């Protein structure tokens, strides 16, 4: 403990901790609701400066502080679920950025300070966080900050969000090298850093200009119903009377003309299932028959294990159940409670009295000769899942979601940003259907159109052009993550053979790490 206190009292360490906090704040400002996306290109400069010359353990400390600050701001809407949700998720986020810091510290010790290696050390833990624990949490991946920047979306079509994250880190790292070289008046280092930035800009320009164009395969006319206008939890009486279902059926009466698909989003039928309620099923089919449309509805449907699926169901105008898709990636502390028995003393167990069962089959629906995939709620944040649907032949993707629990927070805007990147990665049109907003149509390049406001009843009616063909990301998958892992392994092997000479000057003496083992425990 004395060593920890001595370390934290050191002025150089304090400056670096302050830099980590600053980076966390700046990066949070790059995401919705602030959405200063291009700020991400400089937001990591303080953090990477803090990592420069740092030991592995101290770099891990700086990474942890950065991650906690960033995630604490980005995921502030988790407060709706209490401390039992936000504390472990934010701390877990910090653990992954601590791992990035540790890897960078190991590279420092080996004399390897390349921006490309720092980017690899970022991408690999980011990919791990998207997969483990509890199925992963890709929300807030670095590359998503540039969701409204067309060249970044073009990059995503080549290598997914991971490639965008990689490029952002490289740019930030070269800016640090350039700044230090300028401060130390080291001409060679300035030339190398400037050349690196020029190379990155050139690569992005080429990727943007040579973007793979998916092929139009037809058109589908869709309508999504956004019926919830209550910015609060519904009363017991409202739930019993089917408040949400009635609001959505009332919106359906406003539809005119033929449609191919009409979407009743996640939770729009309250707690009723059309498979166990013939009257409800008849009403859904009647809506479809009136417009010659298939109806995509969502309901809680009994599962074989006695629990329930969160399930999308597709009904034809003739009344046939054409197929179902059960949500695969359930929301921790939202649709199930990890370690339920250990946290049964908290209020969250009262709000989530039972756990859903995850689905196991990825269904491609057939609609008017086209192949349509659906994902439910935050599943649109999982690039590999959506990629697999497209690889199986999906020509359009519908995101059925219920974000009402997050009220008027930035969650819904962040959700749209995730879906933009999925559209850009796959070259498919997306329709985001939400019971309370934000609903939207997103083009194959990730451009958003026809958006709605939160908690306003609305109908999004549009014709989308379905597409076929595989972008490089769909064809080759997470090749950036694999390449980053191999790059780190190669660096580890090279460091055992010889210690390469430092390319860039060290920081001024006042900013260097204090002499010692560098351990904080």
For each predicted feature, which ranges?
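Short Lys/Arg-rich cationic patches that frequently serve as NLS/NoLS or arginine-rich RNA/DNA-binding motifs
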Residues: 277, 505-508
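Membrane-embedded alpha-helical bundles of multi-pass enzymes
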Residues: 2-212, 407-408, 419-422, 434-442, ...
